[in-house]
């Protein structure tokens, strides 16, 4: 999983990158578009990620009409996590990276892998799979350290 940031307008390959990132931050004046329909084309590759982050109707409207949306609308529809001023973009991305890297690294990786696996399962298949993952998480070193740190009222040491 990755984070992406957009300092300008986003379309085509950049849009694919944004839709496939776990976190996406854009400047407030960025525009997002999939204009292929205006050229007699369809954004087939973009759909792989688009419908995983945007509601179906909003995503279909976005690709069927090919009209750009602004960063506020992109945030409202779930295409991005947050829109910020141009001057705050680098600091916001840096703060996010710092926050994520300060969390339990083994558990983060394990959890993201479990997310990927269960994403293609039916609800009834996912529940027993995820129940097993909970047990494995509790057995891991991050859980042991996190619980000990909580009980000892200290910050965890993930090293």
Predicted regions: what they are:
Residues 22-23, 61, 65-67, 73, ...:
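Well-ordered beta-strand positions
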Residues 43, 47, 56-59, 105-111, ...:
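A general structural signal for well-ordered alpha-helical segments in protein cores
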Residues 1-7, 11:
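Single conserved hydrophobic/aromatic residue that forms the stacking wall/gate
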Residues 65, 77, 110-117, 149, ...:
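Short acidic/histidine-centered micro-motifs embedded in hydrophobic/aromatic stretches
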Residues 12-63, 92, 96:
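CoA-thioester-processing core
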Residues 25-30, 80-128, 135, 139-141, ...:
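C-terminal long alpha-helix characteristic of the crotonase
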Residues 17-18, 74, 150:
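Key positions in alpha-helical "signaling/recognition" and NTPase switch elements
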């Amino acid at each position: 999983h990755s984070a992406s940031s957009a300092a300008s307008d986003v379309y085509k390959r950049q849009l694919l990158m944004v839709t496939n990132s776990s976190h996406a931050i854009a400047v407030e004046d960025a525009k997002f578009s999939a204009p292929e329909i205006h050229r007699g084309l369809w954004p087939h590759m973009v759909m792989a990620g688009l419908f995983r982050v945007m509601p179906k109707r909003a995503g279909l409207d976005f690709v069927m009409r090919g009209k750009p949306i602004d960063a506020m609308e992109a945030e409202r529809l779930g295409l991005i996590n947050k829109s910020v001023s141009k001057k705050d973009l680098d600091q916001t991305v840096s703060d996010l990276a710092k926050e994520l890297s300060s969390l339990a690294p083994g558990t983060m990786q394990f959890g993201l892998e479990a997310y990927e696996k269960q994403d293609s399962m039916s609800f009834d298949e996912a529940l027993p799979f995820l129940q097993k993952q909970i047990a494995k998480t509790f057995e891991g070193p991050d859980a042991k350290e996190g619980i000990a740190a909580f009980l000892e009222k200290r910050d965890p040491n993930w090293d």
